[in-house]
């Protein structure tokens, strides 16, 4: 959405719960985990993760749900935390869409970041066959040439939405925050 992002619009536990509910409303499937339950992967910048760790609801949930002592993810300095079926990852290369080149501030004077929630099929990969390896001699066997080839590719799927009647990313929700 193109709504204004204010300084108070920081990542929070409530935002994560709402993102997960929105994902289920949009029929975005989670990724099947070991026990058969669905999990989502959330990516945010180190600054976004720092702001999330300062959220009182997030702190209460991680503090009380996790193990006690130094193994608690909150105190162990973990960059990935599992909360309410969402793996939250700190990632340095998260898009800051409204940032200008000189200040890092968007159109509303707020330094922002984009939080991404990825479910199943947020990324598509095609892998066609085994790689090939070819060797050839040149210059009367004084030089060897080696060639490898592999056909593969990745893309972010986009589909026509029956809900919104538009083209949208598949398996992904993006939220801009301060």
Task: Tell me what each language-model feature is.
Residues 2-25, 47-178:
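Sequence/fold signature of self-assembling virion shell proteins
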């Amino acid at each position: 959405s193109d709504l204004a992002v204010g300084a108070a619009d920081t990542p929070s536990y409530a935002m994560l719960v709402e993102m997960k509910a929105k994902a289920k409303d949009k029929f975005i499937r989670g990724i099947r985990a070991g026990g058969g339950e669905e999990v989502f992967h959330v990516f945010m910048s180190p600054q976004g993760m720092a702001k999330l760790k300062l959220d009182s609801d997030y702190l209460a949930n991680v503090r009380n749900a996790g193990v006690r002592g130094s193994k608690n993810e909150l105190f162990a300095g973990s960059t990935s935390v599992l909360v309410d079926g969402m793996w939250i990852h700190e990632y340095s290369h998260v898009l800051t869409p409204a940032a200008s080149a000189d200040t890092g501030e968007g159109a509303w004077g707020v330094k922002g970041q984009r939080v991404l929630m990825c479910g199943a099929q947020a990324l598509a990969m095609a892998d066609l066959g085994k790689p090939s390896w070819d060797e050839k001699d040149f210059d009367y066997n004084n030089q060897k040439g080696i060639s490898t080839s592999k056909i593969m590719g990745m893309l972010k799927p986009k589909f026509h939405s029956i809900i919104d009647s538009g083209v949208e990313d598949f398996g992904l929700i993006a939220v801009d925050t301060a």
